[in-house]
């Protein structure tokens, strides 16, 4: 309801840009909750863990949907499909990382009318690319019309000889659009996926491979590279959610209460972003474009909700705290020492 009220319907070439990803959440230890209890994992002590699956509007910078699962029952593919099916958006472009590489996910996206960009494993990684005959060059943009079947009979055996034309998948592989049981003489079921598999150079000696159903005439390789890089917004939002909004500082151990706190923090993140989006930044001729500093905005929005400052003062303060946008920067991740967070300094 809140999302609908603040929806600006921002689009890229007519598409709503959505990123889907998951993130682990360490919650207060509760050995009685066996579904979330991690008894042992290398270099880790026993703890409880939830998994947040989120759909994120890249242009508006807010979460449009979320599904929270427990450690032992987590299933990112199932969560993705559920979020697609209940989304009111009919013309979206969803961008996913390699964790969502599967024919079943591609089929659900194609059937829903959504476009997608999904990063896939390189040949040899036991992924989609392994079963295809791809060009022997460093970069390529290769169209594929692939029929999926669970049957091996006279009708399919000849087609299966061409791995770019037909693919057999056994019953143990999940694919919701083909029956697992059939009788002799039943017509052969086929489901055709239409996509491009693209390999792009991202830096010296580094390449990314992805599948997409975007039309080639409208979206060339370089544009796909730029679009995929925009997926990083959801990674940044997870950091904001955990360490600025304060999602990791739980008050309760009970699963239902922990779940409630997670959704409360998602709402707080969205409200901070919605209010920030309403603040108009003054146009200046500077070297960089500027964006509102989320860390400061979250504190200001909290004070606004508590009645400590007026809406006008909140707008002025948010407008004053901006950061330059410096694109194409990357740094290696360096682990740092971590201290506890005092309750006084948490946002929520």
Language-model region placement:
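Extracytosolic and intramembrane catalytic regions of membrane-associated proteins
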Residues: 38
């Amino acid at each position: 309801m809140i999302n609908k009220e603040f929806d600006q319907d921002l689009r890229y070439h007519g598409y709503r840009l959505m990123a889907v990803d998951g993130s682990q959440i360490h919650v207060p230890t509760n050995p009685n909750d066996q579904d979330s209890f991690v008894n042992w994992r290398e270099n880790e002590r026993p703890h409880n863990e939830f998994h947040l699956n989120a759909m994120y509007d890249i242009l508006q910078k807010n979460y449009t949907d979320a599904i929270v699962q427990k450690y032992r029952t987590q299933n990112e593919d199932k969560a993705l499909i559920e979020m697609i099916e209940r989304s009111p958006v009919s013309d979206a472009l969803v961008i996913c990382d390699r964790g969502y590489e599967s024919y079943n996910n591609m089929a659900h996206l194609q059937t829903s009318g959504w476009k997608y960009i999904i990063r896939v494993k390189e040949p040899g990684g036991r992924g989609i690319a392994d079963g295809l005959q791809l060009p022997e060059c460093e970069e390529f943009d290769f169209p594929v019309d692939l029929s999926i079947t669970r049957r091996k009979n006279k009708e399919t055996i000849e087609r299966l000889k061409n791995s770019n034309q037909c693919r057999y998948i056994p019953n143990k592989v999940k694919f919701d659009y083909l029956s697992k049981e059939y009788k002799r003489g039943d017509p052969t079921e086929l489901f055709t996926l239409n996509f491009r598999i693209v390999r792009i150079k991202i830096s010296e000696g580094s390449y990314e491979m992805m599948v997409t159903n975007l039309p080639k005439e409208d979206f060339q390789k370089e544009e796909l590279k730029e679009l995929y890089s925009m997926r990083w917004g959801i990674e940044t939002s997870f950091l904001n959610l955990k360490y600025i909004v304060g999602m990791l500082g739980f008050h309760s151990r009970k699963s239902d209460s922990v779940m409630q706190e997670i959704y409360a923090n998602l709402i707080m993140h969205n409200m901070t972003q919605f209010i920030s989006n309403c603040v108009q930044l003054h146009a200046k001729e500077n070297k960089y474009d500027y964006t509102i500093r989320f860390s400061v905005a979250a504190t200001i929005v909290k004070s606004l909700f508590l009645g400590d400052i007026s809406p006008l003062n909140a707008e002025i303060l948010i407008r004053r705290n901006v950061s330059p946008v410096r694109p194409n920067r990357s740094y290696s991740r360096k682990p740092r020492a971590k201290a506890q967070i005092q309750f006084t300094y948490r946002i929520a």
